[in-house]
Amino acid sequence: MEASGTDDVEKLKSKFLSAWHNMKYSWVLKTKTYFKRNSPVFLLGKCYHFKYEDSGVTADDCSNSGSDSKEDLSGNVDEFRKDFISRIWLTYRKEFPQIESSSWTTDCGWGCTLRTGQMLLAQGLLVHFLGRDWTWTEALDIFCSESDFWTANTARKLDPSLEKSSPENEEYVSLGKQPLQNSEKKRYSEDLHRKIISWFADYPLAYFGLHQLVKLGKNSGKVAGDWYGPAVVSHLLRKAIEESSDPELQGITIYVAQDCTIYNADVYDLQCNKGNEKAVVILVPVRLGGERTNMEYFEYVKGILSLEFCIGIIGGKPKQSYYFVGFQDDSLIYMDPHYCQSFVDVSIKNFPLESFHCPSPKKMSFKKMDPSCTVGFYCRNAREFEKAAEELTKVLKSSTKQNYPLFTFVNGHAQDFDFVCTPVYDQNDLFTEDEKKRLKRFSTEEFVLL
């Protein structure tokens, strides 16, 4: 009887907190985000300039982008805007089906790191299925409450012709020259776009949805309503993709680095499993300092975000998690999950997509960043992994101020260095004892999220 009364109190408490958080995060302070005209902007490996083409800007201005192609340089703000809006935005939601073994129907106030982890994986899947150059054809139709930001000191008014996809943006999916073929490719890419979003839906059967991640988190001692750090979320995403049964997801896997070390042979084994070459998402949990972020690491972070292989960073500032996607000068560009939106039923044909795309980026100073974060990369095959390892090694060795790089690549398997790499799992226990200890250690090191 007493236990029943305690359960009722806990349910009442969670309902009160849910109502409070739903109200709190349904209101957003509208602050304008400004970008400088004279500095390049980097977004997940692409470089943009907010200048007119006759302004004398050259590709040398983007020399630290890590890319050999001058085509990455753009003089059009709208191209940057379209690219940014096309990234999948996953935020707090309310009124979704109740999470198993809990009374939660919202993740407001506790699920922000799960959301930023989802966004990073979603970007990896977009690149995997549609290519980095893909953009959503309706991106420029998204209403931006900060419309002044797009025009102040930077851009002309939107040209209606820009709302149509350029040939460059459609190159990955538009393989034929016939209008019918182009139309079919366009429909195919939009179907994939919707399918990727549906994998992150807020209902129990979604492979990478909140319900599934919380379910997997139980094996590491987490429950709905707990906070999750970037490293813990990395392992949950890895488990989620291992558990997925969709045939289209069998061609991609996730590797989580151990103690800031990527073991090349382990990555190759994942990519060439059973003779079938797979793409790999590499997640590297790191710390950028002790209690505070060491400013000397910023050059590393900028170099990483400039690479074409980068799919973002799960990080944030103390008590808040953000998805970092780029930078300008000393400011990071990010997507913010701290906005409560209503549940969307993705089982409905042509469900609305607008709430899954962020209309405007935000910026913050690097010095405000919490030192705990997870860096993400995507490699389509073993050859791309070799290239990524080469480029990243250059970036990680570029600073002479730090004696130790952010992370390293090591030849061989983790087990060669007395680490557990590819454990045999008990079908009833998703995490090995070694992993549980590591996750517990990560949990005590990472920042508390509200």
UniProtKB/Swiss-Prot annotation:
Arranged from A to Z, the UniProt key words for this protein are:
Autophagy, Cytoplasm, Hydrolase, Protease, Protein transport, Thiol protease, Transport, Ubl conjugation pathway
Localization of this protein: Cytoplasm
Q: Which domain of life is it from?
A: Eukaryota
Cross-referenced Pfam families, in alphabetical order? Peptidase_C54 (PF03416)
Cite the EC number: 3.4.22.-
Any one GO biological process: aggrephagy
| Any one GO CC term of the record | cytoplasm
Q: What class of enzyme is it?
A: hydrolase
Reactions catalysed, as given in the entry = [protein]-C-terminal L-amino acid-glycyl-phosphatidylethanolamide + H2O = [protein]-C-terminal L-amino acid-glycine + a 1,2-diacyl-sn-glycero-3-phosphoethanolamine
Gene Ontology terms, MF aspect = cysteine-type endopeptidase activity; cysteine-type peptidase activity; protein-phosphatidylethanolamide deconjugating activity
| Main subcellular localisation | cytoplasm
Active site positions: 112 (nucleophile), 336, 338
What PANTHER family does its record include?
A: CYSTEINE PROTEASE ATG4 (PTHR22624), CYSTEINE PROTEASE ATG4C (PTHR22624:SF38)
Q: Which family does it belong to?
A: Belongs to the peptidase C54 family.
Q: What does this protein do?
A: Cysteine protease that plays a key role in autophagy by mediating both proteolytic activation and delipidation of ATG8 family proteins. The protease activity is required for proteolytic activation of ATG8 family proteins: cleaves the C-terminal amino acid of ATG8 proteins to reveal a C-terminal glycine. Exposure of the glycine at the C-terminus is essential for ATG8 proteins conjugation to phosphatidylethanolamine (PE) and insertion to membranes, which is necessary for autophagy. In addition to the protease activity, also mediates delipidation of ATG8 family proteins.
Full protein name: Cysteine protease ATG4C
| Protein source organism | Xenopus laevis
